[in-house]
Structure formats: structure tokens, C-alpha cells
Amino acid sequence: MIVQIGRREEFDKKLLGEMHKLRAQVFKERKGWDVSVIDEMEIDGYDALSPYYMLIQEDTPEAQVFGCWRILDTTGPYMLKNTFPELLHGKEAPCSPHIWELSRFAINSGQKGSLGFSDCTLEAMRALARYSLQNDIQTLVTVTTVGVEKMMIRAGLDVSRFGPHLKIGIERAVALRIELNAKTQIALYGGVLVEQRLAVS
């Protein structure tokens, strides 16, 4: 697999189109979420804010996109703050250049690992943690399902809730903080911290 992280304008239209079609397949067709799909692509207003994306591609000549993540700076609009503020349960929405929000995670991989995540998902999480720490990001926030929360906890990540889960659409949704501290890094990388890897790379 090939993992790339960059701003929207750094990716060509072909890759962005594949990403938006993948999101439509995963969120609308597979999960049945109430999302808007235009020309077989799932796009929302946050995609107009020059977000960062992680694109996961097959390591083949076609290099088809089969996974993606959207990454937004919390100093501007983002989903937890502006779309799902009820999941904050009255707490102040994070606003810091050192905190990013993850959203629109989609992957086409049926392989499951021992902790519930596919090997591809775990590799994507490692790449995201490495990139975040390289850019002085200390905390990630996300709106996800209770099922994914359980897998994160089982994997050993340092995860905490803003408050109880709520039923949103067909999902039991929860807002989480993920600290990119030693606990999370050891869970993702074993005994060697990301900072140590960066220092010798």
C-alpha cells in the first residue's frame, strides 16, 4: 500500500475523484448514512476548506485509492464543532493549532487483525501518528461510532470521551480525544516511540 498525506490542492483530480467515490460507496451504499452524493461522489462543505487528506492507494500500476481520511485544523470550522456540537455535551470545542480533527475515514479492506482493525487501517494509523508528530500535533479529535471506540481502546490508544454517546442517524456516535503520547505511540509502534524513530531517521 502507498500512503500519502497532503492538502487538497496537492492531489490531482483523478485521485480526489477516486476518494470521493470511495466515500460514497462506504458511507451511502454500505453504511446507509444520510450523506449527499452527487455524480457518485460524496462531498461536503468541509472539503472546500483546503483540508489535509490521507489517501491510501494500492501498490500496483493502477494505484487505485482504497482508503482515505480527512484532517482539519481545529482553529477553523470542523465537524465536531460545527456539525455535531451536541456530542461536546456543553464542553468547549477544541481550538488549537496543535489539535487536528479526523473525519471521513473510509477503507475497502476486509482483512481483520487481532485487535479488530485491518492491517491496512493500523498502518494508516501509524502513518498518521508519525505525520502528526512531525507537524507538532499533540491531540486528535474525532466523531466516530461506539464500535470503533472499543477497538481503539482494545488496541491500547489513549482515548477519552467528551461525553456519553448519542444516537445520530443510525449510529451510536461519540466524540473522542486521542492523545499522541507515549501510551498511544507504544500501542501503535511497540517499544520504540515515534519521537525516537524521528530522531534517528
Swiss-Prot record:
GO molecular function, one term: N-acyl homoserine lactone synthase activity
InterPro entries linked to this entry: Acyl_CoA_acyltransferase, Autoind_synth_CS, Autoind_synthase
Catalyzed chemical reaction(s): a fatty acyl-[ACP] + S-adenosyl-L-methionine = an N-acyl-L-homoserine lactone + S-methyl-5'-thioadenosine + holo-[ACP] + H(+)
Gene Ontology biological-process entries: quorum sensing; signal transduction
Keywords: Autoinducer synthesis, Quorum sensing, S-adenosyl-L-methionine, Transferase
This protein's record includes keyword ATP-binding: no
Family stated for the protein in its record: Belongs to the autoinducer synthase family.
Role, per record: Required for the synthesis of PAI consisting of 3-oxo-N-(tetrahydro-2-oxo-3-furanyl)-dodecanamide also known as N-(3-oxododecanoyl)homoserine lactone, an autoinducer molecule which binds to LasR and thus acts in elastase biosynthesis regulation.
This protein's name: Acyl-homoserine-lactone synthase
Record organism: Pseudomonas aeruginosa (strain ATCC 15692 / DSM 22644 / CIP 104116 / JCM 14847 / LMG 12228 / 1C / PRS 101 / PAO1)
Upper lineage: Bacteria, Pseudomonadati, Pseudomonadota, Gammaproteobacteria, Pseudomonadales
Gene name linked to the record: lasI
